[in-house]
Amino acid sequence: MLNISEYRDLISLFGEFSEKELSPKRLEIDKGGEAFKGAINKLEELGVFDEEINSIPLPVKIKIIMEFSRGEAGIAQFVAKSWTVGNLGIARSEKLVQFPSERVYYNGKLAEFKGENVDVLGLRSCPWALGEIRVLGDYGNFDKEILFYDIACLVGISEAALESAENYAKERKAFDRTIYDFEEIRGFIQRGRSYVEGIKGALLVSEDPMKLLNLALEMAYFCTDKAMQIFGGYSFINEYPVQKFLRDARMLRSLLIRKLW
């Protein structure tokens, strides 16, 4: 049985990077461009894209993706893509491609892609394009691994949303006390954390991510929605990251929910 603690130092290294380099800059990175490229370059220096990473067990990789997505989900998505399909883009539907390139991965197939870049609701730091896909032939099937990483991203986004909401609630005062002192507010956060811990634990031992997908989508919806409620009117101000968590979670939901149909 895998002992994840054997990889504690590696997970901590990437977790510390996420906390110090991604979280404080997440709104800037969300705009893409140089901030996104700069973060990727630093990860390259840390060895995230070295061939040795391929030998790391999947549950450890899942933990690392969780850590990165707590900082900035688009960065986590890029790392996950690199660990699965390398330099290929990922076709998320028959027309929508994430990290577009001339060759894309499409449901276990290698495909040719031509399209135009588009702006999207969430995961804005990732480039996206709409266009035409032409299947060229079979390719190694990475659908299952990609889904594991997508759910890991939902976990990280949910954790970040709850953390931001809790920190805000402990500072924001109403009726001469912090709003964290109100039972309902604490209940939102505690319930969200129970969802997160349940999905996180199951994800690390599961052999089939599809069995967790519906619960993971519900978890992310609850955590990001309640975080928005806790921030109140401030949740709609771009200076706070809580709206980004909601957008990123909704974007992943729109990409993944069709798998449940």
What positions do the PLM features span?
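FAD-binding core of flavoproteins
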Residues: 2, 75-77, 87-167
